UniProtKB/Swiss-Prot annotation:
<dbReference type="GO" id="GO:0003723">
    <property type="term" value="F:RNA binding"/>
</dbReference>
<dbReference type="GO" id="GO:0001682">
    <property type="term" value="P:tRNA 5'-leader removal"/>
</dbReference>
<dbReference type="GO" id="GO:0005737">
    <property type="term" value="C:cytoplasm"/>
</dbReference>
<keyword id="KW-0540">Nuclease</keyword>
<keyword id="KW-0255">Endonuclease</keyword>
<keyword id="KW-0963">Cytoplasm</keyword>
<dbReference type="InterPro" id="IPR002730">
    <property type="entry name" value="Rpp29/RNP1"/>
</dbReference>
<keyword id="KW-0819">tRNA processing</keyword>
<keyword id="KW-0378">Hydrolase</keyword>
<dbReference type="Pfam" id="PF01868">
    <property type="entry name" value="RNase_P-MRP_p29"/>
</dbReference>
<dbReference type="InterPro" id="IPR023538">
    <property type="entry name" value="RNP1"/>
</dbReference>
<comment type="function">
    <text>Part of ribonuclease P, a protein complex that generates mature tRNA molecules by cleaving their 5'-ends.</text>
</comment>
<dbReference type="GO" id="GO:0004526">
    <property type="term" value="F:ribonuclease P activity"/>
</dbReference>
<protein>
    <recommendedName>
        <fullName>Ribonuclease P protein component 1</fullName>
        <ecNumber>3.1.26.5</ecNumber>
    </recommendedName>
</protein>
<dbReference type="InterPro" id="IPR036980">
    <property type="entry name" value="RNase_P/MRP_Rpp29_sf"/>
</dbReference>
<dbReference type="InterPro" id="IPR023534">
    <property type="entry name" value="Rof/RNase_P-like"/>
</dbReference>
<comment type="subunit">
    <text>Consists of a catalytic RNA component and at least 4-5 protein subunits.</text>
</comment>
Amino acid sequence: MIYISEFIGRHVEVIQSSNRYDVGISGQVSFETKNTFEITKGTGKVIVPKEGRIFTFDGKFKVDGSLINYRPEDRLREYRKILKKLGGN
């Protein structure tokens, strides 16, 4: 399940956002906090909030940023909450 995976090192693109200027930002995730991704693109870095955005990872996995709004080390512990929000068991 991509929602509990490690995102650092993956290619990411913002495909939907409450801020229209964020749509289309893409690059490699170089750092992650509870609320943000640091995306390396070209020669610069951009910090993008997770909340209110939908991302694609590696060009195939669509992820709602609101559901991964946890510290990376806490996502596995919060697996049941994430699954419930996704409509699973």
